[in-house]
Amino acid sequence: MRLVLKFGGTSLSSPNHIRNVAKIVASFSKDNEIVVVCSAVDGTTDDLLTISRLIEEKKKDDVTKALNNIIKKHKQFANQTVKNSAIRKQLIQKLNTDVSELKELVRGLTLLKEVSARSLDYLISFGERLSDDLVSFALQDIK
């Protein structure tokens, strides 16, 4: 059977919660074809919306601080979620790639001092992208 499993931000609010999500996915995947949909880690969407507001308010230092907090949180989660060092290293590399793209976007928006609707959608998508990384590698870690 094909199943879609959707996990909200509260389900991804800590490394333990992320590992539990991976275990749930693994348990359903034994006899089913699974599609996993993840929201951003709890609070991340709000943080990204704050960054967009700060960009428009021209508060560059606050933008940098908020962005660094998001990055720090996800890297801490990565280090605490994945136990296998080789898998954790791959996760950190993937996060670094996504974070580099996020930083480039935020830098560009900060230079423009505006966030269009399309840019906001792109910015907000990073919450889901980063949580997808965490869940995907947590799943590899438990197999």
Positions of PLM-derived features:
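Nucleotide/pyrophosphate-binding catalytic subdomain
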Residues: 1-143
